[in-house]
Amino acid sequence: MLHSQNLQNSASKPLVSFIITTCNTDARQLRACVESVLKLSLSHNDRELIVIDDGSREPAINVLLDFCDELIYVRQPNQRLSMARNRGISMAQGKYLQFVDGDDYLLQSTYEHCLDLVRYHQPDLVLFQLSTSPKVPLADDYEGPCTGVEYMQTHNLRGTACGYLFSKHLLHGLRFTTMRHYAEDEEFTAQLILQSKHLFSTSAKAYFYRQHATSALHQKQPKNKLLRLQDTEEVILA
């Protein structure tokens, strides 16, 4: 296990902990991901950047040496995404948490709106939109506050855990299920939303999602479709 030096003042907790997970991510994409966090209007003490390297063939820290003073790096044997995120949760000291996949990145201009909602309204959770294009319109709209139950009565669930900036106090021991192949996000985010008593949502597209033909959501083989349906059924009936 490798750790970079964490220079954060231990006397005060950061506002947001960003949990970046990576496994054999392209070097340029991983650096762009880290840089997108560092460009935000958060001081060094207001942010915590945790990179969980889930068994990459070559240590991801090798391409992040320029950022060692800005992040905490942990390398572990490959245990899949859920375990990597759970590791990040256990380490995070921030009041709020944000998951970022290592090949994606935050869209600065619109993510700032989400940070403003946190600063001025102290919500339990901010729900924002994802984009497959790096060019997005500015947005400063929002709805809320409402409870998670009220939100779910009028909206469909968006499973991806990267679409939420949420207060750590919502977790109450909640973690990602490690036995599922596909529906771990849906189970986690549904419970997270239902725990929320002070939820805000915005149309701001604040997260760039890189589509891959090999990703779980794009697997077309009957076996993979069946596994996803089985996992989804278990989540619904749980």
For every predicted segment, state its role:
Residues 230-238:
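Amphipathic alpha-helices of TPR/Sel1-like and other helical repeat/solenoid scaffolds
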Residues 1-230:
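Nucleotide-sugar donor-binding/catalytic module of glycosyltransferases
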